[in-house]
Amino acid sequence: MKYILFSMAFIFLFTNCKKEDKQDPLLSQAKCVDINNPISISINDLITDIDTIGLEVTDSSLLGDIHMLHIMNNKLYILDTKGNAIYIFSRNGDFIRRIYHVGQGPEEYIRINGFQVDYKCNRLILTDSFSKRIFIFDEYGELLKVVPLKFSAYILMARNGGFLNFYTGPKQMYGLKDMENYNIHVLDSCGNFVASFLENQTPHRIDLESTERIDYNPNNEEILFHPTFGNVVYRIDKNNQIYPEYVFRNKSSFKLLTPKERREMTHIYGQKNEIEEKESEGYLLSWGCVYDLDDYCLFTMTGWNHPKHIYYNKSTGISVTIDMEKMKGDVSLCKLFNAPIYQTEGNCFYNIIPLYLVDELADKLPEGKLKTFLQNNNTPNSNPLIIKYKMKFPE
């Protein structure tokens, strides 16, 4: 019955919202996020409440290439794509365990493509697109279940006894047209396809993979989903009803894609890159990077080479555009914080600082705790470092 209700909600939504127009009934209930020209601000005034986490180094916990970070029950879960493993650390960085089940056996994976945490059931959901399976572990790293799939999955969340699969990556991934033409797929507990929702607005081939197109709020069990190049961000509530939550309203000198331009967008790896072309023409382009904090939302217009942040205050409805490349203040701080955001918690952001950047900036930062932390961990055998911080909303 939940799947039927979910389907009916989508039918109603998309018969009434064929255009991204604020006159449409459901879109009129969405919150407007104004895109303005970037503000002039110093990095020293923007970044506050900096804290640091050093990850313990042992023979079993030396990390190579951190791809994803999740936090659950005071534990850090890190996907290392080079090591093909999930590493579990305490919140202060003490090593707990490594999940490494590589092989050809029935309880072994070939390669971890992505993982999410199931806050409600305290589980880890790992996806292996090569063997087309889901691996479910408890919060301590014990394998609970392996679920076979008929397709390759990248971003997949446990939901109401089943799963939600979010389309990401190149086109023609699925044998079913009902999956290929839609962004979100409902699966039952056995991994079988049940229904699809939210029609794909980028039907041309887009060889892009973003792990940040969704953000889950464990406090209210709601998901924010931002379709590739979309101007609308959707909310999926705990009953699997979907609504437009935010609509971008352009008041800047940048351009946003029209629905027609979005349908015609193409990115074929090594052949055609309309993302870079459009960015050079002044377009803001998002692959769907959305971060839902307690009091704010951050939308990252990733683009190709020059990302921009749209920082939205939930209580006032005011938004500011931040261009980290044109930030004022200390140059080394600007470079340190002009990095991908890996996780949020409360009103805090978590960034991973790779060792090459630690080596480059350790002696250049302003005197203080942050500089000392980088200097003390600037050794060949250190792990990448984690920085936790807040962004002060500009007055």
What are these language model-derived features?
Residues I50-N84, G288:
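Beta-strand-rich domains and repeat architectures in extracellular enzymes and scaffolds
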Residues K75-D80, N122-D128, G161-G175, D215-Y234, ...:
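Short beta-strand elements that form the blades of beta-propeller/WD-repeat-like
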Residues S129-N181, S196-P203:
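Asp-box/WD-like beta-propeller blade repeats and closely related beta-sheet repeat scaffolds
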